[in-house]
Amino acid sequence: MKYAFFLGCIMPNRYAGVESATRTVMEKLGVELVDMPGASCCPAPGVFGSFDQKTWLTLAARNLVIAEEMGTDIVTVCNGCYGSLYEAAHMLHENKEALAMVNEQLKEIGKEYKGTVHVRHFAELIYKEIGVDKIRENVVKPLAVNIGVHYGCHFLKPTAAKGLGNAEHPTMLDELVEATGAKSVDYKDKMMCCGAGGGVRAKELDLALSMTQEKIENMLAVGADATVNVCPFCQLQFDRGQVEIKEKLGNEYNFPVVHLSQLLGLAMGMDPKEVALDVNFISPEPLLQKLGY
């Protein structure tokens, strides 16, 4: 299997360990990730798409064209990038007027979107194409810890377009986490936003942090040792957000934050430094001690 690897903005700039872990995990699972030359921001669906749909759709289509020219589908590890690119491809497939408008814009740079590319999320690809059993087979260090899974907003919704199962009671990420030997613990308001999305973090930071704090407290209440996400923006909100919660709200949690690719990397025998857990704002030490590092 070969995929065009869409990096997005936050992962290469803030969480390079997520990229490193993703590349290593995918290589071990037999998936070749190919860089996309000239790829731009997805762009963010909750910001660009809300204020200027034409610009959002054209920029997203330009990224899709890069993958088309490479002759392969796209995979990303970011919910926002997945939401933006997937929804753009879906809209261009369903709306011929939108397709004509976009191609009129792309003509100015000598490009045309043909609609041949599919957009996959890293977690969806692993779950559907590789399978939970294959993950279990590759585990060399079972992770005997409790994990609070955070799905995020753009991974599953809009449900009708993505078709990844029940958006209110999903199991996909829980199954992948438990394939590592960890236990996925259920907690109150599991499907609530991390607090960062839709421009909330940028415009109403206090509100965003109160949502993050509520989710962390709900996970801690059921004995979670860490939270696992599938989006660098969610990772930023839980990780950097804890520093801001301490500064603004006076509460300190030191609750480890891990991307799914990093968790899979640990289970497959990668060192914590290989997946760059040591460069998070929040120390992973409480989690690593429980794992015997």
Swiss-Prot record:
**First-tier enzyme category under EC:** oxidoreductase
- Enumerate the GO terms in the molecular function aspect: CoB--CoM heterodisulfide reductase activity
**Function, please?**
Part of a complex that catalyzes the reversible reduction of CoM-S-S-CoB to the thiol-coenzymes H-S-CoM (coenzyme M) and H-S-CoB (coenzyme B).
Look up the coiled coil feature and give its residue ranges.
Answer: none
Q: Which family does it belong to?
A: Belongs to the HdrB family.
Origin species: Methanococcus maripaludis (strain DSM 14266 / JCM 13030 / NBRC 101832 / S2 / LL)
This protein is called what? H(2)/formate:CoB-CoM heterodisulfide,ferredoxin reductase subunit B2
Q: Give a Pfam family name.
A: CCG
The alphabetized list of GO BP terms reads: methanogenesis
Report which superkingdom the organism of origin falls in: Archaea
- Keywords, A to Z? Methanogenesis, Oxidoreductase
Q: Which reaction does it catalyse?
A: coenzyme B + coenzyme M + 2 reduced [2Fe-2S]-[ferredoxin] + 2 H(+) = coenzyme M-coenzyme B heterodisulfide + 2 H2 + 2 oxidized [2Fe-2S]-[ferredoxin]; coenzyme B + coenzyme M + 2 reduced [2Fe-2S]-[ferredoxin] + 2 CO2 = coenzyme M-coenzyme B heterodisulfide + 2 formate + 2 oxidized [2Fe-2S]-[ferredoxin]
Q: Which Gene3D superfamilies match?
A: 1.20.1050.140
